[in-house]
């Protein structure tokens, strides 16, 4: 363990985000890198449901949060909303995400391996495993900034505010503008026709 890594972890331990990670009761993977996040050992995650682990790498502290979660076949994570941004990448499995505002109608979109999406800020969302194999996902968040700024998890996870971005996303989800898969690609990812406009070089 290098001095750089020790100093990095020491600076993280005094933050509201670090205390919150510890209170969640799941493993925290620390280091300079992770060879394969699909192989990380997970623990039961009472708040979110399923299993999970935080990933805290040198250089991320204070700015970026990361976690890996797993959903059993036919299972689902608990609904949540939060006052920080989150980008989710599906590593394995198939399923769907429900998204809704407080008192509003639920919208649903499906995903598969390597789907990438971001629930609108502070909207309720729930991930559901619709397949016969475990779903494993990785998420990158701005939770460290939010938790260190507000220092109040109750406010972060139970704020009634509906943000302008969430209102705009309602229309985007209910009235999609295009196809889930690019028209120039099939399910194998191989081009079926040239995606370049005529005359392009």
Predicted regions mapped to residue ranges:
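Short acidic-glycine-tyrosine-enriched beta hairpin
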Residues: 60, 101-121
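Glycine- and acidic-residue-biased ligand/ion/polar-headgroup-sensing regions
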Residues: 72-73, 83-102
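Conserved short histidine dyad/triad with adjacent acidic residue
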Residues: 48-54, 65-82, 201
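Short histidine-centered beta-strand/loop micro-motifs
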Residues: 55-59, 76-82, 99, 108-109, ...
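Histidine-centered metal-chelating micro-motifs
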Residues: 76-78, 96, 115-127
